[in-house]
Amino acid sequence: LFRSSLYIAFTGSRFALHSSDTVAIEMGYSKKPIDDMLMFHLTFGKSVQDVSLNAIANLGYAEMSFPNPVYVGDTVSMTSTVIGLKENSNGKSGVVYVHSIGVNQNCEEVLNFKRWVMVHKKDQTTLSGINEVPTFAKTTPIADVINIPTIKTVDTDASGGKYFFEDYVAGERLNHPEGITIDNSDHTLATKLYQNNAKVHFNDHMMKSTPMGQRLMYGGIIISTARAISFNGLQNAQWVYAINSGAHANPTCAGDTVYAYTEVVET
C-alpha cells in the first residue's frame, strides 16, 4: 500500500481502478489492483542486478503482457533468460537480449516481456563477430480469455471520463495537454523504490566522465509519466493489456519536461 501511494505521489496517476477499492469492486475486482506500470517497475528492478547493473543504456522492449493483476500483499519474483547477443561495430560494447517472466506467490504469471540492453564488453580489443538477434512479434495476440472481471457498468463520474472503445477511431490523435518536469529528487526516490540500482541512474561521479556528463533518468520514469499524462483522453483505459513494443529513443536528464500524445493505431 505504501508503494502504491508513493507511486501516485511520483507520477500523479489518476486512474480510478488503482486509486479506489470502491471503484475496483464495482468493476468486479476483489479490491484495487496495483498500477500495472508500478508492478512492471518493481518486477523489472529484480532483473537489473543480473542484466543491466553496468549497462550503458536500456534500449527497448517487445511482447510485453500483464496476464494477471497484482494486489497489495502479493509476492512477485522474476527470472530472465538470455535469448540473443549482438556485438556493436565499435567492438567496445554489445546488445544483450533477454526474456523476463514475473510470477506471483502462486506461480501465476503477472508480467512477460523481452528487452534489449547495451552493455560494455570485458575485452574491448577483440572483435567476436557475435550477431544473434532474436525476432519479435509485431503485436501481442489478444487472448481468447482475458483474465479480468466481467464489467457490467463503469461509473464515469468516478473514472473521470465518458469515452469508451466505440468512441475511438483508428488514425485519431489525442494530444494530452499536460507537461511534467522530471526532478532529480523524484527520480532518485522512485527508482530506489523500484530497487533498480543501475549505475547510470545513481553514480553522478561516474557519469560526469561520460559524454552525457550527468546521471540518466530511469526510462521507466518516462513510461510512467506518459501513462499518467494520457489520463486526459484515456480516462477509461484502466488496465494495460500489453505493450507491443517500445524504445527509449532519447535519454532524459533531470530538468527535462515530458509531454505525451496518443495515436489510435487500430480498433
Regions of interest found by a model, annotated:
Residues 54-56, 70, 90-92, 236-238, ...:
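Generic marker of residues within folded, mature protein domains
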Residues 68-153, 254, 261-267:
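HotDog/MaoC-like acyl-thioester-processing domains
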